[in-house]
Amino acid sequence: YSLDVNAAMQPGVMKGSENQNLGANFNMTYMKEKLTMRASVSLNESNSQNSPYGSFSQYTRLNPYYIPEDANGKQVKVLDNNTVSGQSTVITNPLYDATVGIKDGTNSLNVTTNLSLEYMILKNLRVTEQLSYTRGLAGSDRFLPADHSSFELEDDLTRKGSYTKSSGEMSSWSSN
């Protein structure tokens, strides 16, 4: 038999983002005369948090001359506001969004169980059976408060802010 445990804690590229992966594997083999039985169980969990500072692509669209802070050192919500032919274009500050308390993360959990039986009928003749069962759970959680810059052009106060929570599960059997 064997037992393996692994963990990987990785900071993301953007400030405040991270990925955490945990896993464990248990393997066992039993042999008696003409019968061999193998069993394994694998458990894997993954959690990630997206950066409250926005995505890298948001920063690539900003001009270097925008000033993200006011005279008091406080982050401003809007960096630039243009109206062309009646259409408003707002350039928002992703640094501001980090101060309003957003939540944006995902998680998953997977369990896989394998069972293999082998029986030697004759020296060159054997019967095998393999069973596998997998169960998985996944979810995400995203909260943007009403003061988040993505709602800057929204005038209706009842449409500002959002919360999205999703979850899913799967299971599968296979046999050979």
Where in this protein do the model-derived segments appear?
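Residue-level signature of outer-membrane beta-barrel architecture
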Residues: 1, 7, 28-32, 117-119
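Short strand-turn segments of transmembrane beta-barrel domains in outer membranes
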Residues: 1-17
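Short, solvent-exposed loop/turn segments in extracellular or other extracytoplasmic domains
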Residues: 19-21
